[in-house]
Amino acid sequence: MEKTGIIVCGSQGRMGNTIISVLSDYSDLLFIGGVDSNYAADKTTVSPFKDLAELEINKVSAGKFLTLKEALHLTAAIKKKVVIDFTSKSASLIHAEEAALYNVPIVIGSTGFSENDLKTVEDYGKRIPIVLSGNMSLGINVLMNIVYDASKYLGINYDCEIIEMHHKKKKDAPSGTAKMLAESVAKQRHIELAEKAVYGRCGDAAERKKDEIGIFSVRAGDIIGEHKVIFAGNEEIIEITHKAVSRNNFARGAIKAAVWLSEKNKGFYDMRDVLGLNKYE
């Protein structure tokens, strides 16, 4: 059986390292190599491509520094492959463009994209299959459904606040997952998140306004990820919490997305498509 090749972008980061480690559990997948980039305004610095002797990439890439574009060119003989990208929004946009150039599917787990960024990635989805999700875990994606239903049945008289916690080196805030959870509530309540989201409160004008959704971020230690959604009424409080105890969960989700994507035609998908979860009403 032909194995599906996997290239990991952000291979030296927390998620990249975890994905590479977990890939060894999958006999039908082949880790081709890892690219790790630090994109500056006018310069790209990339770590050496991790090569495998059986692919004879080492004859070409030994001692070199490769971009994803160069890595895709070197592995052109491997027809069935997928890129998994956990870098930054700026690097991911470049990688999506390069994947589209070589007609290779890409899974993107980076966060912090603007609406224009998302539109750019969605346009690449007209050329290649793309999965983009702020969280690859089954639990979080199921939680989004639970939060939607909780908002539906509790009603607008229950105020909603979201608290997210991550390790001290996470660069963006709030997390992509917190935004996804807030969007679940906003969609159910038929409001625009951009108009009703409040990111932290400070000063003497912090009184809650109608339909607000508060989102708060904690950055400390090596917290893998914790999200708490609070629905507070006048006489009771409901708290729904998800705690990640291992990055393996996210890695396996990303790998599942890559396998699923390898059999898809062009299109712009999210993790809910991969998991077969119902879309919101």
Spans of features found by a protein language model:
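Glycine/charged-rich beta-loop-alpha catalytic/anionic-binding loops adjacent to active sites
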Residues: 80, 124-133, 233-240
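Rossmann-fold NAD(P)-binding glycine/threonine-rich loop
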Residues: 90-102, 109-130, 141, 149
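Short glycine-/small-residue-rich Rossmann-like dinucleotide-binding loops
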Residues: 87-88, 219
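Glycine-rich phosphate-binding loop signature in dinucleotide/nucleotide-binding domains
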Residues: 75-79
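N-terminal Rossmann-like NAD(P) cofactor-binding module of classical short-chain dehydrogenase/reductase
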Residues: 83-84
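Rossmann-like NAD(P)H-binding beta-loop-alpha module
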Residues: 142-154, 173
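C-terminal substrate-binding/catalytic lobe of Rossmann-fold NAD(P)-dependent oxidoreductases
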Residues: 2-9, 14-74, 156-281
